[in-house]
Amino acid sequence: MKRVLHIGKFYPPAPGGMERVVETVCLASEGLVESRVLAMHTSHETVEDTRDGIHVTRIGTIGSAGSVAVAPGFPGALRRAQADLIVLHEPNPWALLSYAIVHPRPPLAIWYHSDVVRPALQYALFYAPIAKPAYRRAERYIVSSPALAEHAAALAPYRDRVRVIPFGIDASSWRGIDGPSPFVLFAGRHVAYKGVDVLLRALRGTSIRAVIVGDGPKRGEWEALAATLGLGPQVRFTGDAPDVELRALMQSCAVLALPSVTRAEAFGYVQLEAMASSKPIVSTDVPSGVSWVNRHESTGLIVPAGDAGALRAALERLMGDPSLRRAFGEAGRRRVEEEFTLARLRERLAQLYRELGLLAEAAPC
């Protein structure tokens, strides 16, 4: 069986959308290829472990440069890795730098999770030089939606090598319930593009309760904003939540809010978790795959990015109409079962592996 090495930032139980996607892809590939993971550790220690049958090497970090975790041992680990295919999950500056240093021999595919949203000069001076060695060599570029395939400027020179493989979820393990006290849920990293400040301003002057899950550099600022807006006990910041707690919150919430303000939100994996739980979504019209996942007036509502008034109106509409929430939630569940199952993900991965010569044409999915 051929071996595929996935290079991520971190790996579960570390939280994050990319982390969940890498894990899901590895699990969906079981029996097709042997999946291994090279990622960074949240501490200074380098460890190897096995999670759900997947061998994971976590390289210790010594701090960060800006928002980039620094793992000095990463290039050496990449040089020593044995694989028939490397899948580099992007954006991932330290992994790109390591790739540029090592120039590993196995074929390469880039899983393009989202655009790098930076000022043009900053991108040209700092990001593009370390990205070029990998991008020029990659045999395939994988994106999660047709919208991202169309709009990703970094992939424009390589359109013939782009493949759309939407993310998948095990819908059988997600079931929604009607909680005794309806609330809006946000779950994600506390970084600027997530737009939690817009959500907080949307909640001002309403009686809507919200639970905000996650952590990151903006958390302190957003907690202070909630206090300034007088939201008090109306809004609860939980910090990072274990999987079991996040699942319980998702399954008992009334609405998922995804108030992202830039195309750095390329898909919004948390939307799949909401739809699998039969929960409606309020998302924004960022030019990415977010609005391809959540269908306006079908599985939820879509509002202009950065517009607190429109977000407030959408949340009030759904929170005030249990029947509409139920209808949107049921439509979301159907959409997951039709488009975003692990079986569909596995079929698409098998086709990719066949194209790259890792799987025989007759091999079953």
Feature-to-residue mapping (PLM):
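An aromatic- and histidine-rich active-site surface loop
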Residues: G73, L85-R105, I110-Y112
